[in-house]
Amino acid sequence: PAKEAYRLAAATFRDAQVKHLNSQPWQTIKNTLTHNGHQYTNMQLPAADMKIGTQDIFPSAYQGKGVCSWDTKNIHHANNLWMSTVSAHEDGKDKTLFCGIRHGVLSPYDVKDPLLRQTGAENEAKEVLTAALFSKPELLTRALEGEAVNLKLVSVGLLTASNVFGKEGTMVEDQMRAWQSLTQPGKMIHLKIRNKDGELQTVKIKPEIAAFNVGVNELALKLGFGLKTSDSYNVEALHQLLGNDLRPEAKPGGWVGDWLAQYPDNYEVVNILARQIKDIWKNNLHHKDGGEPYKLAQRLAMLANEIDAVPAWNCKSGKDRTGMMDSEIKREIICLHQTHTLNAPGSLPDRSGQEIFQKVLLNSGNLEIQKQNTGGAGNKVMKNLSPEVLNLSYQKRVGDENIWQSVKGISSLITS
């Protein structure tokens, strides 16, 4: 009885915490950073601020609030849903360099009823698609005018697809099933969107989703958990993105081949990213830390952005691994903007790259998102494990002990 009383008290306390965190104001976070005379703006825009008129666009309105990562029984909303952008200030105006959608896992994993959990996962996936459409203003306008629009999304899960420690294997299954249910071949789906007059309007979209999962924590990269399961999803998604011939020297097919056939301005960058991804895949470099834990995940999101698809990425909570992915993307995007070259997979940032990374880690909005979700700022990716061999390469990548500690913050004191 004492154990049961403790369990009930803990659950009641947690529910109260969730209610408190959800009902805080969830507002857009904007930070600027300067490097080599260039000014960049990082913006994290929460679902509550995804508006065409005065209200947010979602049928189940957020009303200025949010859904924190601890709200694991919510079947109406995606957890921790934000649009993340980085822009450069050029010729008196801001030019968007990257825009994507970040969120928690598409699985209300503490819901016991499997049918209800599946319905919840599909509702969450629809919200991510709605946010993805919002991130493409021209496409959104066409959809609101009655056109059935094609929406390409590259989803990059960052979970460890194994149930050995925790339930992330089941969560990955829930997420993949939700994406599959929305993307049967030729399937049109109807989304309800609140238009500028505040009325719910049905829009028609034909979603195409390349759904990846790439484990990035110590369990995956040091102990090998979940790699085989993840790669069974990844090979299919790579075929969608790059065509059936995944040899590094092969001409890209799939979505990338279609994009390159138009001889776009970014032809070279797209080609290099495609080649890097195929090199990583061929040599299983994404199975090891190798100096860069997010090497595959980050390049998939960048490639999606370059070919005008919507990149979306998530871990379980949408704050720690998701936040580190956000920072790695922005580091590489700013480096590319400065040097016009892409870093090789597995390379540690050089001195300038480390400076950019340090500035991004402190000024990307990720510490604020952690605080919004838990009441405390800090990223749990930053760990000091014993034995030392289990540590990921983050101290080397950041290159400054004080900044590493600042980013780690109080995360080790926070559960899940």
UniProtKB/Swiss-Prot annotation:
Pfam families: IpgD. It is an enzyme of class 3 (hydrolase). GO terms for molecular function: phosphatase activity. The keyword Hydrolase applies. The active site is at C315. Keywords: Hydrolase, Secreted, Virulence. Belongs to the phosphatase IpgD/SopB family. Contains the consensus sequence Cys-X(5)-Arg characteristic of Mg-independent phosphatases. Converts phosphatidylinositol 3,4,5-trisphosphate (PtdIns 3,4,5-P3) to PtdIns 3-P and prevents the transition of PtdIns 3-P to PtdIns 3,5-P2. It is one of the known effectors injected by Salmonella into the host cell and is required for invasion and for an efficient generation and maintenance of Salmonella-containing vacuole (SVC). Alteration of the phosphoinositide composition of the plasma membrane causes membrane ruffling and actin cytoskeleton rearrangements. This is Inositol phosphate phosphatase SopB. It comes from Salmonella diarizonae.
